[in-house]
């Protein structure tokens, strides 16, 4: 586990929640991949389209980290109400190279093969 991977993901959440799109882009690789069960898109343009249209705030909770993969349990607030979800990030050289939304923590952990042993903190 490295502190920089966690710090990158926390800063990414802050930028998303504050709609600070310049910082969101600066924390993401040029070819960042953004996806969920419906599909994926790549690049800063796709990231910005998703961030501007999502209308969500995602407050990070428990974090799991191993080999550049960070899974974050999230408390999500949107126009539809409050829920929980999880996102799986790949972080390389302090940049998010991919982020995939999952409906729950269990599916994010299964997709990344992380376990309770990888719980940060």
Q: Where are these predicted regions, by residue range?
A:
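C-terminal and inter-domain tail/linker signature
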Residues: 1-121
């Amino acid at each position: 586990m490295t502190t920089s991977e966690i710090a990158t993901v926390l800063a990414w959440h802050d930028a998303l929640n504050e709609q600070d799109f310049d910082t969101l882009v600066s924390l993401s690789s040029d070819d960042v991949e953004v996806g969920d069960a419906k599909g994926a898109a790549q690049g800063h343009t796709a990231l910005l389209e998703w961030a501007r249209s999502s209308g969500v705030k995602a407050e990070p909770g428990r974090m799991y980290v191993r080999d550049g993969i960070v899974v974050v349990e999230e408390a999500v607030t949107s126009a539809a109400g409050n829920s929980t979800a999880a996102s799986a990030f790949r972080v390389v050289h302090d940049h998010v190279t991919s982020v995939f939304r999952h409906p729950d923590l269990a599916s994010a952990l299964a997709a990344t093969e992380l376990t309770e042993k990888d719980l940060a903190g």
